[in-house]
Amino acid sequence: MNRPVHNEHRRKRFAKKCPFVSAGWKTIDYKDVTTLKRFITERGKILPRRITGVSSRFQALLAQAVKRARHVGLLPFVGED
């Protein structure tokens, strides 16, 4: 038995461009809190690549910068409720 294919349930996936690559960034500074907050949820979690469109290299640099900013005290470990 084959299932009927419903076209309304299929979604086209668009290739997301990495904002850091398109802007020409080489590294991510942990002191740039406004940029880091764009990639963090309200709860303080780092957003995944599939949502943000960040490349794998910059996702690793982003995670490292967020963790450094948390330890220094620039970003909270847990977001406000």
Curated annotation (Swiss-Prot):
Gene3D superfamilies tied to this protein: Ribosomal protein S18
Entry-linked InterPro entries: Ribosomal_bS18, Ribosomal_bS18_CS, Ribosomal_bS18_sf
Pfam families: Ribosomal_S18 (PF01084)
One annotated GO molecular function: structural constituent of ribosome
Superkingdom, natural source: Bacteria
GO terms under cellular component: cytosolic small ribosomal subunit
SUPFAM superfamilies: Ribosomal protein S18
GO biological process: translation
UniProt KW keywords: Ribonucleoprotein, Ribosomal protein, RNA-binding, rRNA-binding
Quaternary structure, from the entry: Part of the 30S ribosomal subunit. Forms a tight heterodimer with protein bS6.
Purpose: Binds as a heterodimer with protein bS6 to the central domain of the 16S rRNA, where it helps stabilize the platform of the 30S subunit.
Similarity comment: Belongs to the bacterial ribosomal protein bS18 family.
Protein name: Small ribosomal subunit protein bS18
Biological source species: Chlamydia trachomatis serovar D (strain ATCC VR-885 / DSM 19411 / UW-3/Cx)
Gene that specifies this protein: rpsR
